[in-house]
Amino acid sequence: MSLKSILVVGAGGAVGLEIVRALCARGADVTATYRTPRNGAAAAIAAAGGRAVRLDLADRDAAQMAIEQAGGVIFTPILTVSAPAAALLRPGQAAVFFSSNNVAVDPQAEVYAALLAAEKRVAAAAPQAAILRPTMIYGYPGDGNLSRLNAAMRRWPATPLPGDGRGLQQPVYFRDLARAAVDVLFDAGRHGAICAVAGPQAVSARDLYEAAAIAAGAPKRFVPIPVKTAAAALGALERAGMRLPVKAAQLRRSLDDKTPRGEVILTETLLAEGLSALAAAMDGGALDAQPAAS
């Protein structure tokens, strides 16, 4: 079966919708699934050019039927959720899965050890499938990363900065990640590969915070916090059952070098441009507005 007919699993979110748009721009016939019946999910998929279908990957029979009807598949749910579906792919059927760059950064952490095990499961069941390991994904309200930082900077007069601010990041703009996934699906040379996907530039945590403050129109006032002490306090609160916006493990990893490892796909959107687009979207501007470099 040709790659004219593509299935996008998990298209109800921002990255999934961008994948649908990118595929439709290539002239593909796109079936796009969503699991959670959020208001407007089906309409958003239709507006992006896809045919919306509600699907839960846990429904193996329904997933099998959808996969069998597609030439290729892009699975946007994190790999610990989507890995079992690799066994449903036909031999040689093109597919793309999403993991995390942190698998290479902190493989001992429980969550990333689970992702690494899921990567191995996919490779065994579908050796032709490509696995993408994005760095920090940002660029839309609710991205869970820089949108949260943007909101905090607007709300408070100063922002806590973990440690000395020298830990490196290389965030990837969500639209670039979507296009990278589509490019990999159509590139037979990358089938079976594991690729990190990152933005074009590595920045220190301090530089990242400064760029975020500029985009948010917020003061560039940062208060260094001792990571070990703060992480210990957060860990105690977690053990007490409190739900916190930042986990102790996340805070500890803030000191790590999170630049991409191994085979790397570098994307185009500069951090300042992506952050400006994010700020505009959080102000109620159209998410359709493209940064200059995208």
Tell where the protein language model's regions lie, with residue ranges.
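A conserved pocket-lining segment of Rossmann-fold NAD(P)-dependent short-chain dehydrogenase/reductase
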Residues: A151-V172, V184, A188-H191, A196
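N-terminal Rossmann-fold cofactor-binding loop
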Residues: T33-N39, L57
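Conserved Rossmann-fold cofactor-binding substructure of NAD(P)-dependent oxidoreductases
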Residues: V53-A70
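Glycine-rich "substrate-gating" loop/helix at the edge of Rossmann-like oxidoreductase active sites
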Residues: T135-G142, G163-F174, G199-Q201
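N-terminal Rossmann NAD(P)H-binding glycine-rich loop of SDR-like oxidoreductase domains
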Residues: I6-A25
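Conserved Rossmann-fold NAD(P)-dependent oxidoreductase catalytic core, especially the SDR/UDP-sugar
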Residues: P37, G72-V73, A83-A125, A129-A130, ...
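Mid/C-terminal beta-alpha module of Rossmann-like enzyme folds, strongest
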Residues: D187-L244, T269-S294
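Residues in the short beta-alpha loop(s) of Rossmann-like NAD(P)-binding domains
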Residues: G12, T36-R38, Q201
